[in-house]
Each structure stands twice: as structure tokens, then as C-alpha cells.
């Protein structure tokens, strides 16, 4: 039986070995590509997930920053309003206090004037009920006062001693007229007006004395 050719078998084995090696390399390359693709896909998912997480955190921080900024602006505006009110407050209070003080002073002044006018020359006092002092002559009217002053030589030298009775009669006689002429005047102002008229009135004993002196 003839022998087989050994060299041919060696070449065939080498070819098969090379083929197997090439296949193994190709399979390894393919496997690597598959693994790389898998890792790449996983990386993309991770990156997207991280990006979404980062975006969410960024939006949260931005919202928090806007909230803080709005709070700061609100506090700043509130502080300005309070500061403005603090500056205006004392001024209003001061004006109110000044007006109240002036009104109080005016009221006190009017009360004092009324008390003084009533004490000096009581308008409501009825001279007909005044009890004459000892050593004096009672005069119920202006004519009586003038008659007393004119008939008493010693008293005529000092007519000011009978001024009060004469003025009281003058005031009672002329107060209604002055009130009618000056309806808006207070009692103290009416009395001042009468006093001015009294200084020039011929019914004033002092004026009568001066007139009598001038005729001599």
C-alpha cells in the first residue's frame, strides 16, 4: 500500500491553523466591538442621566437664588417704607402737639379774660342791690352819680372814687348797643370796646371835671 504525502498534510494543517487563528481574531474583534458598543451605550445613558440630574439641581439652585433675591428686594423695600414713615412720623406728631398746645393756651387765655372781666366789672351784677359802704352815697343811675359828684364839693375833687359806680351804670346802659353792633365779639372784647368809649364819654366824671375846669 503506497504511503501518503506528508508535506501536503503539513500545509493543510497550517492553513487550517491560520484560518482558525484568523477566525479567532475576527471573533475577538467582533466581541470587542460588541462590548465597546455596549459600554458606549451605557456611557450615553449614564451621561444623559447625569445631565438630567445636573439640570434638575441647576434649576433648583436657580429657583432658590430667585427666591432669595425676591426676599432681599422685599426686605429692602420694606426698610425704605419704614424709614420714610419714621422720618414723617415725628413731624406730624409735632404739628399735632403744637396745634394742641396753642389751642390749650388759647382756651386758658379766654378763661382768664372772662374771669378777669367778671372780677373787675361784673356785668350781671345788679347795682340796685349793692349795699352802700359806710360814708358813701348810693347812686343807682348815671344821673344820680353825676348829681352826687356835682353836689359834693369835697368829693368832686376826687371823682375817681366814684368811677366804678358811674362806669357800671354806663356799661349796663350801653352793652346791648355794643353787642348789637358787634355780634361776633366775645364778652372781653365788648368790655374793651366800652372802656374805650368810656374814656371819651361825657358821662365820665373825669371828663366832666376837665370840662368844668376848662370853662372856668
From Swiss-Prot:
It is found in: Cytoplasm, Cytoskeleton, Microtubule organizing center, Centrosome; Midbody. GO terms for cellular component: centrosome; cytoplasm; midbody; nucleus. Keywords: Coiled coil, Cytoplasm, Cytoskeleton. GO terms for molecular function: transcription coactivator activity. Residues 201-216 have a biased composition (Polar residues). Residues 18-90 have a biased composition (Basic and acidic residues). Residues 18-119 form a coiled coil. It holds the Pfam family Ccdc124. Residues 1-93, 194-216 are annotated as: Disordered. InterPro entries: Ccdc124/Oxs1, Ccdc124/Oxs1_C. One of its GO terms (biological process) is transcription by RNA polymerase II. Ribosome-binding protein involved in ribosome hibernation: associates with translationally inactive ribosomes and stabilizes the nonrotated conformation of the 80S ribosome, thereby promoting ribosome preservation and storage. Associates with translationally inactive ribosomes in the nonrotated state. Belongs to the CCDC124 family. This is Coiled-coil domain-containing protein 124. It comes from Danio rerio (Zebrafish). The gene is ccdc124.
Amino acid at each position: 500500500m503506497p504511503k501518503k504525502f506528508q508535506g501536503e498534510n503539513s500545509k493543510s494543517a497550517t492553513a487550517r491553523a491560520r484560518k482558525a487563528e484568523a477566525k479567532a481574531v475576527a471573533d475577538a474583534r467582533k466581541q470587542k466591538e460588541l462590548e465597546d458598543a455596549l459600554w458606549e451605550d451605557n456611557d450615553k445613558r449614564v451621561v444623559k442621566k447625569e445631565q438630567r440630574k445636573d439640570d434638575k439641581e441647576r434649576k433648583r439652585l436657580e429657583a432658590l437664588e430667585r427666591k432669595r433675591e425676591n426676599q432681599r428686594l422685599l426686605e429692602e423695600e420694606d426698610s425704605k417704607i419704614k424709614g420714610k414713615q419714621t422720618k414723617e412720623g415725628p413731624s406730624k406728631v409735632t404739628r399735632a402737639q403744637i396745634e394742641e398746645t396753642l389751642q390749650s393756651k388759647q382756651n386758658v387765655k379766654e378763661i382768664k379774660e372772662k374771669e378777669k372781666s367778671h372780677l373787675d366789672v361784673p356785668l350781671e351784677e345788679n347795682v340796685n342791690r349793692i349795699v352802700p359802704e359806710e360814708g358813701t352815697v348810693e347812686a343807682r343811675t348815671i344821673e344820680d352819680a353825676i348829681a352826687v359828684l356835682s353836689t359834693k364839693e369835697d368829693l368832686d375833687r376826687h371823682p375817681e372814687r366814684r368811677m366804678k359806680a358811674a362806669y357800671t351804670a354806663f356799661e349796663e346802659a350801653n352793652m346791648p348797643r355794643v353787642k348789637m353792633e358787634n355780634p361776633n365779639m366775645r364778652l372781653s372784647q365788648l368790655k374793651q370796646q366800652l372802656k374805650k368809649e368810656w374814656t371819651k364819654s361825657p358821662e365820665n366824671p373825669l371828663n366832666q371835671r376837665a370840662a368844668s375846669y376848662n370853662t372856668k
